[in-house]
């Protein structure tokens, strides 16, 4: 009997232990998941999509095979760099760099270049931990030799000891303080930037804070100009066209696990850096973030007449044969903050609800985003707080939700008034907001003076079966963010009708002297008989719009209006992926017909 009691007691204890272990494990799992989710988010904030050449991040944030079992299948190389050492990192190699204490370094990047290292001076470094070996995944080490006679196309990392030692004595705190009074400090934990002085940064000695000069993050570019005569390009790169990044930290920081699209040479001026490297063939096990935002690859893409608010068709082609117009937007963006803005807008409004416009003036781009909504009577739209730019996105979204009805872009309008609210984004300017009202020209209208305030609220009457595009010609009035209602200054009509009635339209706009060059220019783009055109008149410019161009006509427009040549070449190479789209363009001219700026439009 006593034995039976003992067995029962022991069994109960075992059951209790099992239950406790289950709940403890569940709690730890949930905690780990929450921690990993936060960590993933942190790395995502630093991650750069394929439109940047650097900083493509992994979701892995700890060198822990318990948290990330796939690390067991990778080959890891670990070593230290000290003052004067250099590390050649070929494109595509994953690297994770920790800085210990005060550390100053310079990174050089280049594309399609080579470095000069004598083959017989390379020694193989064995990895500290070994998983599944990749072909040719080796790291070599050599002492620096000033010999440029041997040329090798090297695809493996190389540690070059004592190859950049001449600057350590020069780059003292005093030297930097005299050169660089003000800096922008990157917080690697919160992914924020603080404007401060170099003296405060040095005195604070905060962990995870550092100074960088990466172009794609648009910070500290002044430092590169200040130090351009002090930073020495190593002799092994003396013939390579490269760019550089100055990197300064005063306490512990780590880069996170990432790779770059360019070959790089990390040169340590002062301090210690601990390095982990993984070969490109380990990428399947390293949990990389996607190279394209979700909104840039929406499938199937829709072919839509964006600014005429008419859905033409949903594409049914295989996904590998077509791309949406949002990819045309993505390829113009090289600013992380703007990518974040578009991500937020997409998360709020979803696909096929946001129209974008990209405007080019002397090579400088401005991005505009338009929201098509309906309202019974135009209402007051609150002004954004220009003194608090960090808060404008959520505030603008709230305004839209409170004041406007959301209308799906792929459905006909079934309300009386169409409002188009928009805001601009420029890296150097705060966005502004405007609202456009669309309404038709009365049949007997001969002069703008005949319009009165009541006419402005007689927007086109539509039904679920009737789309705005069947009500040509359309006349547009502007209701701006200062709530001043302006009379109409834009006409939309079929191209053939615009040319036929050009005298009447230009008389309405009071610019009959522009007839010759406007008539010739309208015929320059758009061979399709269903092409729609628009004339928009402002104080000192005339805007001409074409709706429904082919991709080849769109490329012609980009080439002739000084859009970025790299962008045009990319589109020309991949033009078949966009042949299903009907493109919309605009060119603004002065009254003599000289082009001033251009733009194109699409949908997210």
UniProtKB/Swiss-Prot annotation:
Transmembrane segments: 4-24
Main localization of the protein described in the UniProt heading: membrane
Signal peptide as annotated in the record: none
Keyword annotations of the record: Membrane, Transmembrane, Transmembrane helix
One Pfam family hit: Cupin_8
Alphabetized InterPro entries for the sequence: Cupin_8, JmjC_dom
GO cellular component, one term: membrane
Localisation: Membrane
Annotated JmjC domain residues: 1-127
Membrane topology type: Single-pass membrane protein
Descriptive protein name: Putative JmjC domain-containing protein L887
